[in-house]
A protein has these predicted regions:
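Tryptophan-centric aromatic hotspots in well-structured domains and transmembrane helices
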Residues: 8, 37-39, 64, 96-111, ...
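Conserved beta-strand scaffold positions in the cores of enzyme catalytic domains, especially
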Residues: 53, 91-92, 147-150
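Rossmann-like dinucleotide-binding core of oxidoreductases
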Residues: 2-8, 12-26, 30-32, 118-119, ...
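Short polybasic/polar patches that bind polyanions
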Residues: 18, 38, 83
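Intrinsically disordered, low-complexity boundary segments flanking structured domains
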Residues: 40-43, 80, 134-141
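Glycine-rich active-site loop/strand segments that organize a redox cofactor
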Residues: 38-77, 196-210
């Protein structure tokens, strides 16, 4: 079996496939596993369900540090899952899939990557997700805007928002997490919403050791 993508879905599928005794290859275009939790590093990035619910049912974690775990802790959990189920050597990083061809005679897939490698597999699973293509609004003047411009999916962690005048466009799942954090640092924050709603800080807290 060949799996494209080493985020939550790809890792879960890999664990199950390996447990079923299948030979396995997981191709990941990035330099690390994690998918969404590797890519997203914006302020306040965390799971929006309780941490103890945000794990594989077959690999539960009891020692989450917070009610809503941050991206770094979730990424660490995925690394632990990969090691616990022996997937590390099955994952090939920096392998971007460019072409797939199904051979009717052999009933095998031929999978070619950007690096020139070719893989053959009886089964191919796409686990690329739908959160890896940042979408910018089509606004006049956006391309010529001279100030700092960032997308929540490709956040520049080196840029300091302290004392800045900031505009956030949108109020989706990422926005409601980052808005309270940006508001703590920005000199002035304006949020542009198509459908107005209130944004409040999540009821988060650190867990105490027992």
């Amino acid at each position: 079996m060949l799996i494209v993508g080493a985020g939550f879905g790809g890792i879960c599928m890999g664990i199950k496939a390996k447990g079923a005794g299948l030979n396995l290859v997981i191709l990941e275009r990035a330099g690390d596993i994690g998918g969404t939790w590797r890519e997203n590093v914006y302020p306040g990035c965390a799971c929006d369900t309780r941490s103890h619910h945000y794990s594989f049912s077959f690999f539960m974690k009891s020692d989450w540090s917070r009610r809503f775990a941050g991206h770094a802790e979730i990424l660490e959990y995925l690394h632990n899952a990969v090691d616990a189920f022996g997937l590390r050597n099955d994952i090939h990083l920096k392998q971007t899939v460019r072409a797939l061809h199904f051979d009717e005679d052999s009933s095998f897939w031929s999978v070619k990557t950007e690096s020139g490698a070719t893989y053959r597999a009886r089964f191919v699973v796409s686990a690329v997700g739908q959160l890896n293509q940042p979408a910018w609004p089509d606004l006049p003047g956006l391309e010529t805007f001279s100030g700092k411009r960032m997308h929540s999916a490709t956040w520049d962690t080196s840029y300091d928002l302290k004392g800045k005048t900031v505009a956030v466009i949108g109020n989706g799942a990422s926005a409601v997490q980052l808005i309270p954090e940006v508001a703590k640092k920005a000199k002035h924050l304006t949020v542009f919403q198509r459908s107005p709603n209130w944004v409040v800080e999540r009821n988060d807290r650190a867990f105490r050791e027992i």
